[in-house]
């Protein structure tokens, strides 16, 4: 029994080390992607790069970062050891996401605005369905909407609290659509209307998908 128990600990430890290595590789990849994007932004400011291409790269990198973070979170849930290291991975992820957010805002200053930036602050409430609503809206609007999600209860990273303070967030879940702040659960209808109006402001016309969606939710 002791041998089996020790063997189980060894296997678990080896598995966790492998998972941690994977997590480190994930964050390294995204850091490299971010550095590449920032260099392309600087290149673009010299007038030699294409805004459309840059925005496409930004969207792809954010989507990949979100997918890969799901893997890191799964690893954390399965882990019994090295909690501090996993928390460092989470910090690294959130900092990288914040850098992507700031980079996207800088790109908007140089290029014609290409997408609506949505910031989602969530807590650990099992009853929170705001994330599902945002997933749905992301599927509907595609590249026209970029979503940045932050765990409001992750106190290990001070920058999250800086964002919460800057947007004066006091109730969760909270959603920021460009500069409009919604605190507490916000319905799909309200967010959809807000996003559609923002897109209308960018393109000068209401997208057909918005007209169809408005009819469905009347």
Describe the role of every protein-language-model region:
Residues 94-125:
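Short active-site neighborhood of thiol/selenol oxidoreductases, capturing the structured segment around
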Residues 119-123, 142-158:
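Thiol-based oxidoreductase modules, predominantly thioredoxin-like and allied folds used
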